[in-house]
């Protein structure tokens, strides 16, 4: 006798089992039947693929170790690579709730075992996941401790004092969908045991960029961004947006937004960078009618617009970052839609470095060997050791964001999923030889997909 299984049979059986269990729940405490909650708790998750990277908005390496890297994903926690080729998640099971969305990560320059992690991304799409505060690790990411700022929601940057690992600054955009008093710059001098808000403009304005003079850690620059997200749109820019500077570790901040040479119109998002080899050189990429890339050679007192190309700021709300080479103050990187742009003449002209995926958000430049780059984009984290000529694959980090998943009636059933900026994929739920290989998955659509649904009894019909 031949028995034919179908997903419809399994669904029916599951409904009967759950119904039976539910019916026993109300029979009093003497019932020996387990409730559905206990039944479901026995199930275990397993990764089935497709092992593709998802959006990464924060990355960092470790000076002194050319093969150690960290990448924060916006839906899959923090990942670590010890060889530049393989990645492992180091926050699974340790960060509660929505903390799987990572907005910022920083390594203490004076003690690379100390890491700070800010949850909730600040690149304000309409599908962002809020975070629930800041975490600290004292053992290079093996264990994590919650250290506060639960209501910051979206952390855009973390900066650690170059000499004291317990002095740390956090830039917060706050609640992105409403005015929020938890926006601004926060400081701790005791490793996160206590916090003080050092820079606040108003409830509509958060801190989107924060950089430090590595030679004088009391000198910092902050970019404040007046922005509120709505499900149907974004309000970017206003009188709250601006650039601020402190020379006393955040005790006092000076508004330098209207210094000579900077835009005279309303500002939107701003990205900042200090040239470590010559910290009087500061770069700013500014969203404004008269915006562009600006450079100061006197620590922010005067500025010159050195570039106004639209290609560097065509999606200002999503990227708008700039990074100066730690050794060469005239080499500058600007991530953008379809490339990582690089300039070798102080941001006057830029050439394109192609990356494995578009929508580029961030780049870390190794201060010991500036040919080593770690870049984050909508397809994951990728590493170059030749100045951006070649990059590692992003198909080794299962962090892509799935909007929706579906299954068909095959046995074993197949899985269909639509991903943020990675298209839609179809793959098996099991594999006779063990782990499901990447080759077992097939891309069925490209671009920004939301649903991928087959006809249940005929998966060839989408």
Task: For the regions a language model picked out, list residue spans one by one.
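Bacterial N-terminal signal peptides that target proteins for export
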Residues: 2-14
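Cleavable N-terminal signal peptides
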Residues: 15-16, 26
């Amino acid at each position: 006798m031949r028995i034919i299984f179908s997903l419809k049979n399994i669904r029916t059986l599951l409904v009967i089992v759950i119904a039976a269990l539910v019916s026993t729940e109300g029979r009093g405490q003497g019932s020996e039947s387990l409730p559905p909650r206990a039944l479901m708790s026995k199930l275990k998750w397993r990764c089935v693929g497709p092992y593709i990277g998802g959006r990464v908005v924060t990355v960092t390496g470790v000076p002194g170790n050319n093969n150690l890297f960290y990448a924060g994903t916006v839906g899959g926690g923090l990942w670590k690579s010890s060889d530049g080729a393989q990645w492992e998640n180091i926050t699974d099971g340790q960060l509660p709730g929505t903390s799987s969305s990572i907005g910022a990560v920083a390594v203490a320059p004076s003690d690379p075992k100390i890491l700070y992690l800010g949850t909730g991304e600040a690149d304000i799409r309409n599908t962002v996941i809020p975070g629930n505060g800041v975490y600290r690790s004292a053992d290079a990411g093996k264990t994590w401790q919650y250290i506060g700022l639960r209501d910051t929601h979206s952390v855009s940057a973390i900066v650690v004092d170059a000499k004291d690992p317990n002095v740390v600054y956090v830039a917060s955009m706050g609640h992105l969908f409403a005015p929020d008093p938890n926006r601004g710059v926060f400081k701790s001098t005791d490793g996160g045991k206590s916090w003080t808000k050092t820079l606040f403009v108003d409830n509509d304005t958060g801190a989107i960029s924060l950089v430090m003079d590595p030679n004088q850690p009391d000198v910092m620059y902050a970019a404040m961004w007046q922005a509120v997200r709505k499900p149907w749109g974004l309000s970017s820019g206003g009188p709250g947006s601006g650039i601020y500077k402190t020379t006393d570790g955040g005790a006092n901040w000076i508004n330098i937004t209207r210094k000579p040479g900077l835009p005279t119109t309303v500002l939107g998002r701003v990205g900042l960078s200090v040239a470590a080899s010559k910290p009087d050189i500061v770069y700013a990429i500014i969203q404004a009618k008269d915006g562009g890339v600006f450079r100061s050679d006197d620590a922010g007192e005067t500025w010159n617009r050195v570039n106004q190309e639209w290609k560097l700021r065509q999606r200002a709300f999503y990227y708008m970052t700039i990074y100066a080479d730690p050794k060469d103050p005239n080499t500058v990187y600007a991530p953008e839609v379809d490339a990582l742009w690089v300039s070798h003449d102080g941001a006057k002209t830029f050439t394109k470095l192609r990356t494995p995926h578009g929508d580029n958000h961030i780049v870390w430049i190794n201060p010991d060997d500036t040919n080593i780059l770690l870049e984050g984009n909508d397809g994951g984290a990728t590493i170059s050791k030749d100045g951006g000529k070649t990059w590692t694959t992003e198909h080794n980090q299962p962090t892509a964001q799935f909007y929706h998943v579906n299954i068909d009636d095959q046995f074993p059933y197949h899985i269909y999923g639509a991903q943020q900026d990675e298209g839609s994929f179809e793959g098996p739920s099991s594999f006779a030889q063990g782990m499901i290989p990447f080759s077992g998955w097939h891309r069925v659509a490209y671009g920004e997909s939301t649903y991928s649904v087959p006809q249940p009894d005929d998966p060839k019909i989408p």
